[in-house]
Amino acid sequence: MKNNDSKISKYISLILRHKPEEIGLKLDEHGYLGVLDLIEGLNKSYEGFSMDDLERIVREDSKGRYSFNEDKSKIRANQGHSIKVDLGLEPIKPPKVLYHGTGRKYLESILKNGLIKKERNYVHLSKDIETASIVGKRHGDLVILEVDSESMFNDGIKFYLSKNNVWLCNYVPKKYIKELNLEEVF
């Protein structure tokens, strides 16, 4: 299965974040899916897919998208859901600034409306410019936004930190957002 890992990982992401019904399943309230159920569902498209394959995909995923429960009987995505799940995240004080990478085509709307979660449960923010830039490049002409997370936190906006170190919040009002000059950053 190794040569299909990237494709399978994207499919697992779709199932665990957005559409478990693709394989006839439903996530529990905390976003978990039974590992054996997932493997059985994946075998409909990827014959021979095994627990070893799943463990390798989780272990080698550079973004840390997935995690097992303690006994590895369940698996879930660490963040990025468009369906309602309770990840059990506790509010936490963020660093002074966080970053958001996006495409230039979205900048006007963001500067007018702030960062909104759209179909996801949270707005995703990065602790460093490099990570934000990797995310943003997927959306076309790169724009990096600096978010004054310290002021947001002091104004009562809650932040959460996912298991794979993605900062999450419900909304970033426009007054806390500043576009960075990429020539000065890189």
Curated annotation (Swiss-Prot):
Keywords: NAD, Transferase
Cross-referenced SUPFAM superfamilies: ADP-ribosylation
UniProt record, GO biological process: tRNA splicing, via endonucleolytic cleavage and ligation
GO MF entries: NAD+ poly-ADP-ribosyltransferase activity; tRNA 2'-phosphotransferase activity
EC number: 2.7.1.-
Pfam families: PTS_2-RNA (PF01885)
Biological role stated in the UniProt entry: Removes the 2'-phosphate from RNA via an intermediate in which the phosphate is ADP-ribosylated by NAD followed by a presumed transesterification to release the RNA and generate ADP-ribose 1''-2''-cyclic phosphate (APPR>P). May function as an ADP-ribosylase.
PANTHER family per UniProt: PUTATIVE PHOSPHOTRANSFERASE (PTHR12684), TRNA 2'-PHOSPHOTRANSFERASE 1 (PTHR12684:SF2)
Family stated for the protein in its record: Belongs to the KptA/TPT1 family.
HAMAP family: KptA
Protein name according to UniProt: Probable RNA 2'-phosphotransferase
The species this protein was found in: Clostridium perfringens (strain ATCC 13124 / DSM 756 / JCM 1290 / NCIMB 6125 / NCTC 8237 / Type A)
Species lineage: Bacteria, Bacillati, Bacillota, Clostridia, Eubacteriales
